């Protein structure tokens, strides 16, 4: 049984993105909460989400703000530009003119397999694009989906979209 998948983890019966002892996102029945410094920010209701993606490096070092800044400075010295790097975060587009939303989360001490990060991001994108984000508030449903996501081959990114769609259909 899978109790974690990339930065997604089941902690005390709830699914969270990020280290649950630090800054993280929590899947609640009515929406997603963002915990920063032990304080809960206002919950974003599931019906507000139209798209969702996750950005995380395999290791904490890859999500280091200092390393990202150093890379940016070095690239600028060479006359180049850099995109990416920085803290692990989830981005989403919200309905009703609320625009883009971004929430930073703390990287676990453990390594995230890059294939799991890609699959998780595609899963979150597809579930929101289908208008089914509210399902993320059901821990049993998320557990069933994560179990099936864990069976997907990590090295075939083109096949993931169809496979994830089939998993979502099967777990209705």
Residue ranges of predicted features:
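Short, solvent-exposed coil/turn segments at beta-strand boundaries
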Residues: 23-32, 47
């Amino acid at each position: 049984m899978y109790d974690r998948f990339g930065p997604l983890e089941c902690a005390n019966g709830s699914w969270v993105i990020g280290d649950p002892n630090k800054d993280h996102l929590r899947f609640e029945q009515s929406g997603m909460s963002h915990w920063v410094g032990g304080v809960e920010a206002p919950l974003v209701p599931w019906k507000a989400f139209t798209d969702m993606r996750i950005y995380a490096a395999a290791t904490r070092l890859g999500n280091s703000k200092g390393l990202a800044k150093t890379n940016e400075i070095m690239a600028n010295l060479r006359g180049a530009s850099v995109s990416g790097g920085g803290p692990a975060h989830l981005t989403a587009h919200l309905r009703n003119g609320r625009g883009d939303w971004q929430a930073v989360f703390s990287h676990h001490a453990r390594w995230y397999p890059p294939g799991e990060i890609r699959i998780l991001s595609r899963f979150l994108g597809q579930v929101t694009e289908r208008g089914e984000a509210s399902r993320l508030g059901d821990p049993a449903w998320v557990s069933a989906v994560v179990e099936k996501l864990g069976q997907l081959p990590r090295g075939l990114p083109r096949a993931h979209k169809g496979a994830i769609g089939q998993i979502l259909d099967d777990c209705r």
